[in-house]
Amino acid sequence: MKKINKIVLAVGGTGGHIIPALAARETFIHEDIEVLLLGKGLAHFLGDDSEIAYCDIPSGSPFSLRVNRMFSGAKQLYKGYVAALQKIRDFTPDLAIGFGSYHSLPAMLASIRSRIPLFLHEQNIVPGKVNKLFSRFAKGVGMSFAAAGEHFHCRAEEVFLPIRKLSEQIVFPGASPVICVVGGSQGAKILNDVVPKALARIRESYSNLYVHHIVGPKGDLQAVSQVYQDAGINHTVTAFDHNMLGVLQASDLVISRSGATMLNELLWVQVPAILIPYPGAYGHQEVNAKFFTHTVGGGTMILQKYLTEESLSKQVLLALDPATSENRRKAMLSAQQKKSFKSLYQFICESL
């Protein structure tokens, strides 16, 4: 097999796509492979990180049912395609890997046009439109969950999704239990509104309760913090946390959306969770949550339309019961031990 020297990662959009791509990038860098990220929205997520080679290119969704949006999306998509084509010609990669979402479309199209081998990585159990469509042109798909395989038109195999690095161990002295609240990389207003009030209801049952609440970039830190302060709950409220793995390891319970990255990290550290799936995006988060709660047994799910202070506080009290928590941790450990530990890099080498 020809040595792989350069790889393009076609990625963009939210953390659910970008975080797995960055984790995969680390494994490729370890193999002395040069990596370039191409996609829309990278500058917003990566900022001035000089260690990561990336190019933010335009893109648009061609899937809108509104004609004006469809044409606008197609126009942006073409601009991005032209830009990606030039970047790929300059970079001369040996292969490209798409991580889903329309933000990655220009780079994936340019890779196919340049006759570069294309691979895909699918984070969710129900793939999005882009990965399902492009699997017809791909050499293989590495999946975080084996159940996604039935949706693809090429070789598909479960691979180990790299976990974000642990920056440092986190300890909350004297705190018990510790609850982590996170609404994904973009935050979730309903979690910011409902969760603090729900946890205020259980304050009398847990005098040493500590809450680490990640509100997202648009969240109102002051308003969320005020609810905890009024309830006498020790807490930290932040817009983002770069040591997510450390926070999860220090937690007794997580209240979160059910994106694929979060589920993989929860399984890795075996921390039970209450999941409130995002109701849009073709329902993939609900499928993720059902897998985690029903198949794995790692927690419980509350659909957003049923999320109230009362419904959540009841589930939190149940989740913090020692026997319930221990059973859920054991179930997660069992599920994690059954998962594949073949890396995406190994899968690609076998498929070339």
From Swiss-Prot:
Pfam families, alphabetized: Glyco_tran_28_C, Glyco_transf_28
Record: residues binding UDP-N-acetyl-alpha-D-glucosamine: 14-16, 124, 164, 185, 285
A Gene Ontology molecular function term of the record: UDP-N-acetyl-D-glucosamine:N-acetylmuramoyl-L-alanyl-D-glutamyl-meso-2,6-diaminopimelyl-D-alanyl-D-alanine-diphosphoundecaprenol 4-beta-N-acetylglucosaminlytransferase activity
CC terms in the record's Gene Ontology section: plasma membrane
Catalytic activity: di-trans,octa-cis-undecaprenyl diphospho-N-acetyl-alpha-D-muramoyl-L-alanyl-D-glutamyl-meso-2,6-diaminopimeloyl-D-alanyl-D-alanine + UDP-N-acetyl-alpha-D-glucosamine = di-trans,octa-cis-undecaprenyl diphospho-[N-acetyl-alpha-D-glucosaminyl-(1->4)]-N-acetyl-alpha-D-muramoyl-L-alanyl-D-glutamyl-meso-2,6-diaminopimeloyl-D-alanyl-D-alanine + UDP + H(+)
Covalent S-S links between cysteines: none
EC number: 2.4.1.227
Secretion signal, residue range per the UniProt entry: none
Cell cycle recorded as keyword: yes
Biological role: Cell wall formation. Catalyzes the transfer of a GlcNAc subunit on undecaprenyl-pyrophosphoryl-MurNAc-pentapeptide (lipid intermediate I) to form undecaprenyl-pyrophosphoryl-MurNAc-(pentapeptide)GlcNAc (lipid intermediate II).
Family indicated by similarity: Belongs to the glycosyltransferase 28 family. MurG subfamily.
The protein's name: UDP-N-acetylglucosamine--N-acetylmuramyl-(pentapeptide) pyrophosphoryl-undecaprenol N-acetylglucosamine transferase
Originating organism: Chlamydia trachomatis serovar L2 (strain ATCC VR-902B / DSM 19102 / 434/Bu)
